[in-house]
Amino acid sequence: MTPRVLDTNIVLDLWVFDDPASAPLRSALQEGAAHWLATSPMREELARVLDYPHIARRLNARALTAETVLGHFDRHAQLQPDAPRAPYVCKDADDQKFIDLAVQHGAALHSKDAQVLCMKNRLARCGVALNPPLPL
């Protein structure tokens, strides 16, 4: 089973926005059929984003709390030490930690961020598949 790194927007799609396109990944995580790698800074970013007013409104509308979403993170993500800098640098510094971890572990990277998507070929040279279908 190929490990996967999920950026914050993907995590929001999974457990805040309940995006139908994320249903296969959510099911795979819940069934233990997908191996999600993350770091403490990724969890910290998620906690910070969950406090944004537009995200908090969405949580309230769905009768969710930030703690519930962070609980999904804690239950399904396997924490890893921070990864060393990958050979390719993202223009969006906030996304670099996801790239670094994916490169270090040869993990699939799930992201919708344009600055990450434009790196698809470079990441492939490092053994990172960008947004691969399930299963992998």
Identify the residue ranges that each predicted region occupies.
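Alpha-helix capping/helix-boundary segments
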Residues: 10-11, 42, 115-116
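PIN-domain endoribonuclease scaffold, especially VapC-family toxins
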Residues: 27-85
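Residues at secondary-structure transition points
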Residues: 20, 37, 64, 89, ...
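Short beta-strands and strand-loop turn motifs
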Residues: 6, 80-83, 112
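Short, flexible loop segments at the rims of nucleotide/cofactor-binding pockets, characterized by
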Residues: 12-15, 59, 84-91
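Short, well-structured N-terminal submotif of metal-dependent ribonuclease cores
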Residues: 1-38
